Amino acid sequence: MSDSTPPPGILRALADHTTMTLAYTDGDGPQACAVLYALRTGTEDGYEAGPGDPVPALLFVTSESTRHGRALSAAQPAAPVAFTAQRDGQDWSGLTGVQGRGVCRRLDGGERRRAWRMYADRFPYVALSPKLRGAMDHTAFWELRPTWLRLIDNSRGFGHKEEWGA
């Protein structure tokens, strides 16, 4: 399937989760890490999608001093990544999750401020904690733009898949 917006089931699954495993590669080889993300669907208050603006986008934070932060920075302006998002502790019959590929880019200026608002809406405790808020002021915000997504939903039949490509 190829359309500008992923099917509702894929968007719902991305909205239902808050943590993704982000896979990338650097000079030492492949690696993966877990990051919390906020989903931008293009319908948020104050957000106006422009022509060709990718929907959805996964917004996350990470320091550029981490291994994955260094790898993403080194591959700018569009670091290729793969990711998964699923809830822990599921059984086979009800397993749901999203697999994806895309590119990451660092957000600056107005884009960073908008990402911060969406992230704080998704994780209010971050904005309420002076310690976390201070850390966020000095941490890079990133946007993951999916180019391919696959929903796995065993509740609709073992191995049920729904795919989308940009």
Where are these predicted regions, by residue range?
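Short, surface-exposed beta-strand-loop junctions and turns on beta-sheet-rich folds
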Residues: 66-68, 90, 157-159
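Extreme N-terminal tail/first-helix region
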Residues: 1-20
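Short helix-to-loop capping/linker segments positioned immediately adjacent to catalytic or ligand/cofactor-binding
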Residues: 21-25, 89, 126-134
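Short beta-strand segments
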Residues: 17-65, 70-72, 80-87, 95-100
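Charged, gly/pro-rich active-site loop segments
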Residues: 2, 94-166
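Charged, amphipathic alpha-helical segments
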Residues: 3-8, 65-68, 125-129
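Short, low-complexity, intrinsically disordered N-terminal peptides in bacterial proteins
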Residues: 1-7, 44-52, 166
